[in-house]
């Protein structure tokens, strides 16, 4: 059976979609272009599983690109949303006590976040944090890292990761040269390069923004001393250190990567998990910096739906579950089981891969490794990855359709899901070894 025969309704839906939306999707990677398939159209999610309109069931490791750490339609999240709809409403454009609760949870979990502002997306969080850093320091330049993705604001689409990397356009048309000139790009995990940049332009640099665990060129952990070195350099030059924890916040640890690695940034950006699957973002940090945000200070930022009760209640319900004893130990156990099995399956087939993992986020790079930065990530065999992806999808395993995206474990996954995934990978690796596509 051909792929078009296996997914006829999805093929028809996508044919209509491309006439209505650019590329047929509302976010580029969803189009499945880099893996050579038409995307399955999803009908529903339940726990660790997705079901498409053609009747296929998948074990899901995309988790809506990270937010669904509890799995799809977790009962406590559903109950919270139903209660909010029934008793409150959808949005008021006015303060609610729920906002206080979520802000309190975030600031308690992350001591570096002394005050927080809720927004509607990770992009809003990072662009607002950077404006704040520039306004606070009176400087204009920012240092980012090649392959790190911080949303689609102009000044971040310079050697970016995520979809920009997947489609080979890390520098997007439409980004003004004057904006790009104030963005300095350094290699991830290269502290010497950062030191050199600061020696040349340190007095002009407002901030360094970094994914403490890069997740948008695949999962790339920080080398020992890298994050601590960034903290030392930024303090020395009076620049701010911004952790983009949109992906890692409440995933790699309840207190995020800053808790895992013991680093205290000046500003933190959040999203994904704190909305429980609904659109959300947040940025926060030291009180003296955050008090510069309007209406307390002159640095403006606003949003119609910021702090809306639906997203906030879903986020609160999610964090409540994550705070239960044994939660992160469970995620680690499942993730380690999968890592061991995938490594063994690849080795048995003689397929060179590198498995990078931090907690419940991971990537299988088709690359003998090590993978520590943009250059080594992009040296991966994307054709082999595409073949692996197709083989896994046909066996009911739903992975991110890009070599350069992290995958995610959820609390809804079970040991038999992991074992099923390993068995599917064993067949997929065997196929790659003999040249199947």
UniProtKB/Swiss-Prot annotation:
Origin: domain of life: Bacteria
GO biological process: protoporphyrinogen IX biosynthetic process
Pathway per the UniProt entry: Porphyrin-containing compound metabolism; protoporphyrin-IX biosynthesis; 5-aminolevulinate from L-glutamyl-tRNA(Glu): step 2/2
Cofactors required: pyridoxal 5'-phosphate
Subcellular location: Cytoplasm
Keyword entries, A-Z: Cytoplasm, Isomerase, Porphyrin biosynthesis, Pyridoxal phosphate
Primary localization class, coarse: cytoplasm
Catalytic activity: (S)-4-amino-5-oxopentanoate = 5-aminolevulinate
The EC number(s) this enzyme carries: 5.4.3.8
GO CC aspect terms: cytoplasm
GO molecular function: glutamate-1-semialdehyde 2,1-aminomutase activity; pyridoxal phosphate binding; transaminase activity
Residue positions, PTM N6-(pyridoxal phosphate)lysine: 272
Subunit structure: Homodimer.
NCBIfam families: hemL, PRK00062.1
Family: Belongs to the class-III pyridoxal-phosphate-dependent aminotransferase family. HemL subfamily.
HAMAP family in UniProt: HemL_aminotrans_3
The protein, known as: Glutamate-1-semialdehyde 2,1-aminomutase
Species this chain originates from: Moorella thermoacetica (strain ATCC 39073 / JCM 9320)
Lineage: Bacteria, Bacillati, Bacillota, Clostridia, Moorellales
Gene this chain is encoded by: hemL
């Amino acid at each position: 059976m051909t792929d078009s025969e296996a997914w006829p309704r999805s093929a028809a839906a996508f044919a209509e979609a491309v006439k209505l939306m650019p590329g047929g999707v509302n976010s580029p990677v969803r189009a499945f272009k880099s893996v050579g398939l038409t995307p399955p159209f999803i009908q529903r999610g339940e726990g660790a599983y997705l079901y498409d309109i053609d009747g296929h069931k998948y074990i899901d490791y995309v988790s809506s690109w990270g937010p669904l750490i509890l799995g799809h339609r977790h009962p406590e999240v559903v109950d919270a949303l139903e209660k909010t709809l029934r008793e409150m409403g959808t949005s008021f454009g006015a303060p609610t006590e729920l906002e206080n609760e979520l802000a309190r949870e975030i600031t308690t979990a992350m001591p570096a976040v002394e005050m927080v502002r809720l927004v509607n997306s990770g992009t809003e969080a990072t662009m607002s944090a950077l404006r704040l850093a520039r306004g606070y320091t009176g400087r204009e330049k920012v240092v980012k890292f090649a392959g790190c993705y911080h949303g689609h604001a102009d000044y971040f689409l310079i050697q970016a990761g995520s979809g920009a990397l997947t489609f080979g356009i890390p520098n997007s048309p439409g980004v003004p040269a004057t904006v790009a000139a104030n963005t300095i790009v350094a290699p991830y995990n290269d502290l010497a390069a950062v030191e050199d940049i600061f020696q040349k332009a340190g007095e002009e640099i407002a901030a360094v923004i970094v994914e403490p665990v890069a997740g948008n060129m695949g999962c790339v952990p920080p080398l020992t001393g890298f994050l601590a070195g960034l903290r030392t350099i930024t303090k020395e030059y009076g620049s701010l250190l911004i952790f983009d924890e949109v992906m890692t916040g409440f995933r790699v640890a309840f207190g995020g990567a800053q808790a895992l690695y013991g680093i205290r940034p000046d500003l933190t950006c959040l999203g994904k998990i704190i909305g429980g699957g609904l659109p959300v973002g947040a940025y926060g940090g030291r009180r003296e910096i955050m008090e510069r945000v309007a209406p307390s200070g002159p640095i403006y930022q606003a949003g119609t739906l910021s702090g809306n009760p639906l997203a906030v209640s879903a986020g609160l319900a999610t964090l409540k579950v994550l705070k239960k004893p044994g939660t992160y130990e469970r995620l680690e156990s499942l993730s380690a089981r999968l890592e061991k099995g995938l490594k063994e399956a690849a080795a048995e087939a003689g397929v060179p891969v590198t498995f990078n993992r931090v907690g419940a986020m991971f990537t299988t790079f088709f690359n003998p490794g090590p993978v520590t930065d943009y250059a080594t990530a992009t040296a991966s065999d994307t054709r082999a990855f595409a073949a692996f992806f197709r083989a896994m999808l046909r066996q009911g395993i739903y992975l991110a359709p890009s070599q350069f995206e992290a995958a995610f474990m959820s609390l809804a996954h079970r040991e038999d899901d992991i074992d099923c995934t390993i068995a599917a990978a064993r067949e997929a690796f065997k196929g790659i070894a003999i040249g199947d596509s």
